[in-house]
Amino acid sequence: VSGGLHGVGASVVNALSEWLEVTIYREGREYKQRYERGHTMYPLKEIGTCAPDQAGTTVTFLPDKEIFEETVYDYDILKQRLREMAFLTKGLKIVLRDTREDSKKENTFHYEGGIREFVSYLNKSKEALYPEIIYCEGEKDGVAVEVAMQHNDSYTENSYGFVNNINTPEGGTHIVGFRNALTKTFNDYARKNKLLKDNEPNLSGDDIREGLTAIVSVKIEEPQFEGQTKQKLGNSEARGAVDFVVSRQLE
């Protein structure tokens, strides 16, 4: 599943579709515009009225079979991505509805707990080591930071990074900042409370993150990704912002 970066998502979908229609409901009026293979069929025009409180936009399109060999949508891929988006934007309600005759189904995603519920969902088949999901939120240098985490009885770390709701499978500076903050804060606490003797080495980051499930979500105005597929974040300010927010709130 791809995500936008330069504001060209709708233009790309339009160019790759046999046709695309946009219907807008605003201030009691309904407007429409249609495109075919990227070309405007008619300018935006008013086509009727709607309820005064109805507002929003409907975008309908048909993938171009001359471009794509396969035009059948995979419901499960869409379901996973839309669930992610609902977790990452607390309070947002997303309805996924399949109206194809041979596969009719529907799912609704709505999570008031946001990424806390995301961690709970990821840990549902595991035994949590403590009941509370640790949550940190803040902003620094124009970077909004949200982090939720909880350890479980497994031996594997599962830390997932998101930038403007886009998954970064290879991590990046936001994940580096999170791990730095976690390692430093745990070791400072252990030293201060005499859990580590003066002659003992610090706890390693790998040991601290064993069995950890975490979501690290940042919102940043000008994200810099390594590669077009957005696998990894490169903004240095994201590292500092996540480190600052997590360190301060864990202390």
What residues fall within each predicted segment?
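GHKL/Histidine-kinase-like ATPase module
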Residues: 76, 83-85, 91, 95-231
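Flexible beta-alpha connector loops of hexameric P-loop NTPases
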Residues: 68, 167-170, 234, 238
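Hydrophobic (often cysteine-bearing) scaffold residues that line and stabilize catalytic clefts
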Residues: 74-78, 174-175, 238, 242
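GHKL-type ATPase core
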Residues: 1-121
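A ubiquitous short alpha-helical element
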Residues: 46-47, 232-235
